[in-house]
């Protein structure tokens, strides 16, 4: 597998052009892997808070008039802000406290999908005109983008935030700060601000096509089988030919 270490000016990571990837502070350390950290606790709290607020929004019921910004939708917007703010906070805490773990990254990715699905299902329930754009977006975010996001597990990096050592283009277009904003925030903001289902459909379809292109690029890079897989006790069960049983 070929690793890339480049600095094209768009990245602010602690490495220099031509650096040896092995020297970069991006690799997971099994001695520091654990389930509960300050960051994962924040992940659990912000996820629970978001889902509870969405539940209250749905309990408020569908508005009886044509009011767009109904009390229920306002609660959904609050849930969305809690999700985004919490997602930013847990990442910052993990990095600043040096508690980044692959477990935490995976929990964060899964929690993002849970919060996002809850918000968008609530939005489509309140405003059925958004159903098609929402379905397109969730197909992109919960299936294709989810697969892209967990692809880092095939390497020993700590999270997708360090995917630039595998492929700088995939990283820059998916997990740089501008890319995260476009993928996570643009669609929701446009729907809520413009109230235009057709525009949401165009954006969602565009994101879907783009993520499929990223999936094709990832397939060309290839997903290696991580070393260290096998029986939980580390013993090597093999066949007569020496292959894993």
Q: Model-derived features: where do they sit?
A:
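Juxtamembrane helix-capping/reentrant segments at transmembrane boundaries
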Residues: 32-36, 90, 94-115, 162-176
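Membrane-helix interface and helix-disruption motif detector
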Residues: 64-68, 127-130, 194-199
């Amino acid at each position: 597998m070929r690793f890339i270490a480049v600095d094209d000016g768009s990245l602010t990571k602690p490495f220099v052009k031509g650096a040896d990837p092995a020297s970069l502070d991006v690799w997971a350390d099994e001695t520091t892997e654990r389930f509960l950290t300050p960051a994962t606790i924040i992940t659990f709290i912000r996820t629970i808070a978001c889902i509870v607020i969405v539940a209250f929004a749905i309990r408020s019921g569908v508005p009886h008039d044509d009011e767009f910004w109904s009390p229920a939708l306002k609660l959904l917007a609050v849930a969305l802000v809690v999700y985004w703010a919490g997602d930013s906070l847990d990442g910052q805490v993990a990095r600043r406290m040096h508690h980044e773990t692959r477990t935490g990254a995976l929990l964060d990715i899964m929690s993002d999908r849970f919060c996002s699905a809850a918000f968008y299902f609530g939005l489509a329930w309140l405003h059925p005109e958004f159903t098609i754009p929402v379905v397109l977006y969730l197909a992109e975010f919960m299936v294709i983008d989810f697969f892209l996001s967990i692809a880092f597990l095939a390497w020993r990096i700590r999270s997708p935030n360090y995917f630039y050592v595998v492929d700088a283009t995939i990283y820059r277009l998916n997990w740089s700060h501008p890319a995260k904003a476009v993928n996570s925030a643009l669609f929701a903001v446009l729907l809520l601000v413009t109230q235009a289902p057709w525009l949401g459909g165009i954006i969602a379809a565009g994101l879907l096509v783009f993520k499929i292109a990223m999936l094709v690029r990832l397939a060309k890079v290839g997903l290696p089988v991580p070393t260290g897989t096998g029986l939980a006790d580390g013993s090597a069960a093999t066949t007569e030919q020496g292959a894993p049983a």
